[in-house]
């Protein structure tokens, strides 16, 4: 269930800016979609508790993504505890570079949205074959920003 998070917001009854907070939370929900888990999702999470995941699959995907990025000349650190990479965006403009990746049919997210301008985020939770098939696209996008 990677990417699924459960939480809550606790607000002091003494907060004077309640209306502004609610407006901000409402806007966040509209932009991000449902950030609160629906009832069906809560039941799925409860049923999944105690399940085992073959972490070897993710290790192989991480290794594949690292090889693809290294061979294409990207600067990055191997992730140790997450299922995504944050390579440096060639040319420094993460938004422009992510748009170039789209031309290669590669989905990435600008690092600016995560407080890491000049980087981009790539998830490796897709099949290893998908990662390896993207190698040419990563190389072409990188070459366009030398």
What role is predicted for each listed range?
Residues 1-146:
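PLP-dependent class I/II
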